[in-house]
Amino acid sequence: QEKAIRMLSKYVSSTENPLRSDLYILGVCYFNKGNYSNTVNALSRTVRQNDELTQNAYLYLGQSYLKLGDKNNARMAFEAAATSSFDKQIKEVAMYNYALLIHETAFTGFGESVTIFEDFLNDFPNSQYADKVNDYLVEVYLTTKNYEAALKSINKIKHPSTKILEAKQDILFQLGTQAFANVKLDDAVSLFSQAIQLGSYNMEARNDAYFWRGESYY
């Protein structure tokens, strides 16, 4: 790789319009050597066209910016790679990293990250990252206590995981208790019944729903 870097960097510096493919290879060589500033310098010159090379370059750019501590540019690079569809594996990795950065840098309860996590699970239900995304979503659902928004979010997921369904059962129960407290007893019965009908994902929520549904009938 040292030899490749020497040859390519000499070519790039002596040529007015170096080939994008050569800039890309040079950038990847720099990345593999851990020279992230030079990676950015090389690869940022390759993203002039909408093609597979650009999508790959944006993924490397995102990872390089992360290594350099520049989360804002990393987020934009991952977003660019995630919105391109030439390579689905690149799209998957980029979308996951983009969602994480949105979650870390702009977390305001029910924000953009939840929508991106939903989209990720619908686009890549069998992803190696699916479990982590489910964990992040459940964390947001239960810590923000915005149960109505959480239920709407869960209902958008085509193939919810066991963790998501466990959270859904608790959310239905919590919404039922809110309805009960507001003397909306028909709504409370409906919500408690939905929690019960989900089955045994969350036995505590199910048992509590049975009890409070009985109270709601009186």
Residue ranges with predicted function:
Residues 1-218:
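Acidic, polar-rich low-complexity tracts and alpha-helical solenoid repeat scaffolds
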